[in-house]
């Protein structure tokens, strides 16, 4: 597999009245195309800060971040926004679906913003996540697990290179969480999307190809997940 991204000695420090907080302290990661990386750690470990740096929502204090052979822009909001728009998809703990749009319209809107008005892809994505029959319903009319599956379809509608998930099953029960994660795995494999998924839930490791454990802003371990 070709290398998608590489981070070297990434640091993210914050100044507070109590002193400097080291949210990330010397992070070294490289991720290849097609990997599904589970980024595991307790609350306050630095995993969400790392996710924000991966997406260029935040800029590291120091270190190097190369994506597809080019240094990722930092500190210039226009360049960072352009990088996110071209490369990154997101799935969050809260579904953030537009409640006054139908399920299909939620996905079609993202496609249109990306310059693709072909509604057939939106319908194909709903088929992929098992929700074609719900396409004309509104988000409030379907279950939380179904809403998260719509969020997954929406996040890959523009064909992102890298999909980032932040505690995406945090509001779901165990059975629903398993169904959502299986949908995510199948979608990433079919669309050839690389994923980094932040969680504190050990049970989600089996849905990755690799697990990176982080605590106190440092990587504690980095291992392949056995099939």
Report residues per predicted region.
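H-loop (His-switch) and adjacent beta-strand-loop-beta switch element
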Residues: 211-223
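ABC family nucleotide-binding domain
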Residues: 4-211
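ABC-family P-loop ATPase nucleotide-binding domain
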Residues: 1-13, 220-227
């Amino acid at each position: 597999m070709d290398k998608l991204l590489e981070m070297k000695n990434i640091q993210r420090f914050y100044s507070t009245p109590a002193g400097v907080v080291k949210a990330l302290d010397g992070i070294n990661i490289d991720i290849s195309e097609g990997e599904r990386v589970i980024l595991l750690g307790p609350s306050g470990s630095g995993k969400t800060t790392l996710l924000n740096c991966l997406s260029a929502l935040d800029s590291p204090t120091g270190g190097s971040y190369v994506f597809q052979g080019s240094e990722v822009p930092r500190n210039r909001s226009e360049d960072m926004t352009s990088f996110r728009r071209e490369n990154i998809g997101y799935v969050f703990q809260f579904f953030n679906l537009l409640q006054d749009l139908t399920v299909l319209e939620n996905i079609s809107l993202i496609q249109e913003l990306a310059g693709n008005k072909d509604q057939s892809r939106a319908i194909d994505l709903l088929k992929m996540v098992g929700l074609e029959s719900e396409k004309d319903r509104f988000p409030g009319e379907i279950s939380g697990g179904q809403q998260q599956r719509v969020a997954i379809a929406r996040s890959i509608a523009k064909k992102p290179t890298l999909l980032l998930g932040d505690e995406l099953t945090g509001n779901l029960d165990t059975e629903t969480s398993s169904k959502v994660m299986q949908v995510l795995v199948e979608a990433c494999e079919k669309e050839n999307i690389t994923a980094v998924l932040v969680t504190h839930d050990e049970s989600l490791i089996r849905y990755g190809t690799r697990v990176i454990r982080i605590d106190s802003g440092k990587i504690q371990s980095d291992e392949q997940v056995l099939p």
